[in-house]
Design a protein with these regions (language model features):
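Cap/lid segment of the alpha/beta-hydrolase catalytic domain
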Residues: 105-185, 242-244
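Short beta-strand element of the alpha/beta-hydrolase
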Residues: 97-107
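C-terminal segment of N-terminal export signals and the immediately downstream linker at the start
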Residues: 1, 21-39
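Mobile cap/lid helix-loop segments that gate and shape the active-site cleft of serine hydrolases
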Residues: 173-174, 189, 228-268, 273, ...
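C-terminal catalytic histidine-bearing segment of alpha/beta-hydrolase fold enzymes
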Residues: 297-298, 303-341
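N-terminal export signals
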Residues: 6-27
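N-terminal cap/lid segment of alpha/beta-hydrolase-fold proteins
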Residues: 54-94
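Alpha/beta-hydrolase fold nucleophile elbow
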Residues: 200-209
């Protein structure tokens, strides 16, 4: 018969083995759940994206500004499909003195004539001249046009404004894909371009988006591991909220068949373990706050389960709508400084 000390020792070891077994089973269950949802999400989006080929970049012109320069350029997304963009490079940044980079996904706002030029500080609301603000903080910034906006409107000029956007959404849908699938492809090519730039630190890439740009942020996050830090401002509409409030929203939010398997916060949760921050306005009708709060809790849980609770943060500003407020911007700056600088 074992003595008391031996009994305690053997019991402790057995308990440890049991705990490890339970933990291991829990980790496997979580991994399996995420793998299954990721697979379903990929299928609902439209399947795998084509491998990125030669970007075939072209530079149109360069203009010196106060503390940074603007470079108008384009690069290939797919054969016969190019993306116009503007690159902002801070003074003093070069191939010999590299810097972190941030891609900015512009907003929708029913302003199809505005894409890259708003964050680049050339038009639109000064509140959203975020590319300029980030360049002055020392980041290389890429501002591309999303499909259906600015220079990527109907090339035949037959359909205008929302009609062309609706046409493109339906065209991708009947092909077994969706607008989100195309947006993700285009954003991944934007990251291809950023990491190709000699003045960019390829391991220090972030992205930021307001409104539709926020949707683009949590859409691309699960599929682009080169993005180290992601910020979404004012857009986390859940399907539950959309249905409850009969909310008409940007086409990228609508992924055919996905609601049978999960909701938008579940998509954002797949970004873990990489860093994610979300800003929300309490009175923003585009992200009904009841479900948005639940969504933020769900994402936080996903990060905690992945063992990286510290890599997700959120800020809900009281009595604030669909804006980029000073407090929200403080969170954006501090987040990128923490994770990219």
């Amino acid at each position: 018969m074992p003595n008391r000390r031996e009994f305690i020792k053997s019991s402790t070891l057995a308990a440890g083995v049991t705990a490890l077994t339970i933990t291991s089973k829990g980790e496997r269950t979580l991994k399996n759940k995420n793998t299954i949802f990721r697979k379903k999400l990929s299928e609902c989006l439209g399947g795998p994206w084509p491998e990125g080929g030669d970007l075939k970049p072209k530079i149109q012109k360069t203009e010196q500004k106060d503390g940074y320069r603007l470079i108008w350029l384009s690069y290939e997304l797919e054969p016969n499909d190019r993306c116009p963009a503007i690159l902002l490079v801070p003074d003093g940044v070069s191939d010999k003195s590299t810097a972190p980079a941030i891609a900015i996904w512009h907003q929708h706002a029913g302003q199809w004539h505005l894409g890259k030029i708003e964050p680049a500080g050339l038009a639109g609301n000064p509140m959203h001249h975020t590319g300029v603000a980030l360049a002055k903080l020392g980041y290389v910034v890429l501002c591309p046009d999303a499909l259906c906006f600015e220079e990527r409107q109907d090339p035949q000029k037959k359909l205008t404004r929302g009609n062309y956007e609706r046409f493109e959404f339906l065209r991708y849908t009947v092909a077994g894909k969706c607008m989100a699938w195309k947006n993700i492809l285009d954003m991944r090519r934007a990251i291809d371009y950023l990491v190709s730039r000699p003045e960019v630190k390829p391991d220090n890439i972030g992205c930021y988006g307001h409104s539709m740009g926020s949707t683009h942020t949590w859409l691309v996050g699960p599929w682009e591991p080169r993005i180290k830090a992601l910020v979404g401002n004012c857009c986390l509409p859940t399907y539950g909220a959309i249905h409850r409030t009969k909310l008409l929203h940007c086409f990228p939010n609508f992924i055919p068949g996905i609601h049978a398997h999960g909701d938008t916060p579940d998509i954002a949760g797949l970004i873990a373990p990489r860093a994610l921050h979300l800003n929300l306005g309490e009175t923003d009708g585009g992200s009904p706050i009841q479900e948005a709060r639940e969504g933020v809790t769900s994402i936080a849980k996903a990060y905690a389960e992945a063992g990286v609770a510290e890599n997700f943060s959120s800020f809900i500003e009281p009595k604030t709508g669909h804006v980029l407020s000073e407090k929200m911007w403080d969170h954006v700056q501090n987040f990128f400084s923490k994770h990219l600088l």
